[in-house]
C-alpha cells in the first residue's frame, strides 16, 4: 500500500508539482498540502487523471491550531476505488480568508463544508448554501475552536410551563475546580504502603 502511495507521490510531484506546496508520507498515509488558490485545480486533477481516479470525497474536516498565524487546516479525505488508496489534501487558512468551495468538483462536499463552517467558522466561497447544519440557528460561536468555552454561552432547555424551548445564560452550580490528578501511567515518586520491596 505505501509503495503505491510513494509512486503516486512522485507521479503527482512530476505531473502537478506546481499545485502542491508539500507532500508527506507518514504512518503509511500520503498528505498533500496546497494553497487555497490551487485547491480546486488539484482536486480536479486528482479526480480526472487516469492514474489517480480520486472520485470519492470521503470527508472534509477542520483542525484548529490557535498558536499559528493560519490557524485552521481544512483537510480533504479522498478515495480512489481504481487504485484502492486514500490520500489527504490540506489547506491552511485563517478566520478571515475563505477557502474555495469544492462543491463543483465533488457535489458531496456541500454538507461537509457546512459542517466545517458550523464547527470552526471557516468560510467557503462559491458554496450554494453555507449555513449551520449541526448547531441551532441562533447559536453563537463555533464549538470546535480551541478558544470556545467548554460550558458554552447559553443553556437550552424545554420549559414545561411555557411549553417551548428557552435559552438561558449558563449557570454553573459550583465554582470551577481544577482536578490535577497524577496519571496512572506515570507511576509515583513515593513508595506506596505495602510496596516497600518493589522500589529496592
Curated annotation (Swiss-Prot):
<dbReference type="InterPro" id="IPR010218">
    <property type="entry name" value="NADH_DH_suC"/>
</dbReference>
<dbReference type="GO" id="GO:0005886">
    <property type="term" value="C:plasma membrane"/>
</dbReference>
<dbReference type="InterPro" id="IPR020396">
    <property type="entry name" value="NADH_UbQ_OxRdtase_CS"/>
</dbReference>
<dbReference type="GO" id="GO:0048038">
    <property type="term" value="F:quinone binding"/>
</dbReference>
<comment type="subunit">
    <text>NDH-1 is composed of 14 different subunits. Subunits NuoB, C, D, E, F, and G constitute the peripheral sector of the complex.</text>
</comment>
<dbReference type="GO" id="GO:0050136">
    <property type="term" value="F:NADH:ubiquinone reductase (non-electrogenic) activity"/>
</dbReference>
<keyword id="KW-0520">NAD</keyword>
<keyword id="KW-0813">Transport</keyword>
<comment type="similarity">
    <text>Belongs to the complex I 30 kDa subunit family.</text>
</comment>
<keyword id="KW-1278">Translocase</keyword>
<protein>
    <recommendedName>
        <fullName>NADH-quinone oxidoreductase subunit C</fullName>
        <ecNumber>7.1.1.-</ecNumber>
    </recommendedName>
</protein>
<dbReference type="GO" id="GO:0008137">
    <property type="term" value="F:NADH dehydrogenase (ubiquinone) activity"/>
</dbReference>
<dbReference type="Pfam" id="PF00329">
    <property type="entry name" value="Complex1_30kDa"/>
</dbReference>
<dbReference type="InterPro" id="IPR037232">
    <property type="entry name" value="NADH_quin_OxRdtase_su_C/D-like"/>
</dbReference>
<keyword id="KW-0830">Ubiquinone</keyword>
<keyword id="KW-0472">Membrane</keyword>
<dbReference type="InterPro" id="IPR001268">
    <property type="entry name" value="NADH_UbQ_OxRdtase_30kDa_su"/>
</dbReference>
<keyword id="KW-1003">Cell membrane</keyword>
<keyword id="KW-0874">Quinone</keyword>
<keyword id="KW-0997">Cell inner membrane</keyword>
<comment type="function">
    <text>NDH-1 shuttles electrons from NADH, via FMN and iron-sulfur (Fe-S) centers, to quinones in the respiratory chain. The immediate electron acceptor for the enzyme in this species is believed to be ubiquinone. Couples the redox reaction to proton translocation (for every two electrons transferred, four hydrogen ions are translocated across the cytoplasmic membrane), and thus conserves the redox energy in a proton gradient.</text>
</comment>
Amino acid at each position: 500500500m505505501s509503495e503505491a502511495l510513494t509512486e503516486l507521490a512522485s507521479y503527482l510531484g512530476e505531473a502537478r508539482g506546481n499545485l502542491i506546496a508539500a507532500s508527506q508520507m507518514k504512518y503509511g498515509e500520503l498528505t498533500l498540502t496546497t494553497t487555497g488558490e490551487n485547491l480546486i485545480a488539484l482536486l480536479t486533477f486528482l479526480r480526472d487523471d487516469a492514474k489517480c481516479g480520486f472520485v470519492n470525497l470521503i470527508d472534509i474536516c477542520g483542525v484548529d491550531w490557535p498558536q499559528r498565524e493560519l490557524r485552521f487546516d481544512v483537510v480533504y479525505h479522498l478515495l480512489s476505488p481504481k487504485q484502492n488508496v486514500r490520500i489527504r489534501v490540506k489547506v491552511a487558512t485563517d478566520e478571515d480568508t475563505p477557502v474555495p468551495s469544492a462543491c463543483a468538483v465533488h457535489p458531496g462536499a456541500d454538507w461537509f463544508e457546512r459542517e466545517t463552517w458550523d464547527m470552526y467558522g471557516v468560510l467557503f466561497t462559491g458554496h450554494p448554501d453555507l449555513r449551520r447544519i449541526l448547531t441551532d440557528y441562533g447559536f453563537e460561536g463555533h464549538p470546535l475552536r480551541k478558544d470556545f468555552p467548554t460550558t458554552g454561552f447559553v443553556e437550552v432547555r424545554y420549559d414545561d410551563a411555557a411549553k417551548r424551548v428557552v435559552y438561558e445564560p449558563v449557570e454553573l452550580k459550583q465554582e470551577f475546580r481544577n482536578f490535577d490528578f497524577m496519571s496512572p501511567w506515570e507511576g509515583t515518586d513515593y513508595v506506596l504502603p505495602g510496596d516497600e520491596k518493589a522500589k529496592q
